[in-house]
Design a protein with these regions (language model features):
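Surface-exposed, polar helix/loop patches in the mature regions of secreted/periplasmic/lumenal proteins
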Residues: 92-141, 145, 217
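Soluble periplasmic/extracytoplasmic beta-strand elements of cell-envelope proteins
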Residues: 42-46, 53, 63-65, 97-99, ...
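Extended lipid/amphipathic-ligand handling interfaces
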Residues: 50-52, 138, 156-162
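Short acidic/polar N-terminal linker immediately downstream of export determinants
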Residues: 5, 9-13, 18-54, 69-77, ...
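N-terminal hydrophobic targeting signals that begin at the initiator methionine
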Residues: 1-2
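Short, surface-exposed interaction patches in beta-rich subdomains
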Residues: 28-38, 65, 144, 152-153, ...
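Repetitive beta-strand solenoid architecture
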Residues: 39, 48, 58, 92, ...
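Mid-chain, structured segments of secreted extracytoplasmic proteins
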Residues: 66-111
Length: 228
């Protein structure tokens, strides 16, 4: 068998796996988690696949709704897939970590089955706490937070609503390939390397956003919720 033929067969097998995931139905399971969290604490999120909604509130408590979404041929076939996805919540008060754990990857088929598994999060956290978030593939919405934010997304869109422009000191947002939009200075750019920069010497909130492929949308929250 030639090398070209081997690569062709490998590609066809991978394509067949994707098509199989596409033919399956979607099932979901929702779980809730909660822990005490103080003002100016740090929430660290490490997610691989799935959307994340985060909202700030005036409560010393972190509440999480985790929706496991799987693709399977039946509800019975979906049940063992839920067990393969692990939501891990550790810590409390000043330092909390939230992670999504997937099944170990096999060297010869590193991405087998990953298209079938994702976790969507809806999170409420103290409005003045800090956030560090990493997501490989998914959209992120953040609203009502005045603490520091460090956001890194490989593939997806990030929308941030700024609750107080007076408290914002630095906003750095950059997309390696994609689109940025903001009503802070009226930015509206697309292509390679678009970015947003805002600086207010009297503010105290720092926001840094990096997106590899996708969009960054930053809005003032003066007029209520925004919708893309």
């Amino acid at each position: 068998m030639t090398r070209k033929t081997s690569w062709t067969l490998a590609f066809l097998c991978l394509l067949w796996g994707w098509c199989g995931a596409a033919r399956a139905d979607e099932f979901s399971q929702v779980n809730h988690y909660a822990v005490r969290m103080f003002s100016y604490g740090l929430l660290t999120i490490d997610s691989r696949t799935g959307d994340i909604h985060i909202e700030g509130w005036d409560n010393p408590r972190l509440e999480i709704e985790a929706e496991k979404v799987v693709r399977a041929k039946s509800n019975e076939a979906a049940k063992p897939l839920y067990e393969e996805l692990q939501v891990v919540l550790q810590g409390q008060d000043k330092n909390v970590q939230l992670r999504t754990l997937y099944p170990p990857r096999k060297v010869w088929r590193p991405f087998r089955g990953e298209a079938r598994l994702s976790v969507n999060y809806r999170i409420k956290m103290p409005f003045d706490a800090n956030l560090a978030l990493k997501c490989v593939d998914g959209d992120v919405w953040i609203r009502g937070l005045v603490g520091k934010q460090q956001i890194l997304v490989n593939y997806g869109d990030v929308e941030i609503d700024i609750p107080s422009l007076d408290r914002l000191r630095i906003l750095r947002a950059h997309a390696w390939l994609g689109y940025v939009q903001s009503d802070l200075h009226g930015e509206d750019k697309g292509g390679f390397g678009p970015g947003i920069y805002f600086w207010n010497p009297s503010g105290e909130q720092d926001i840094n956003v990096k997106v590899r492929m996708g969009g960054v949308f930053v809005y003032r929250d003066d007029y209520g919720s925004t919708t893309r």
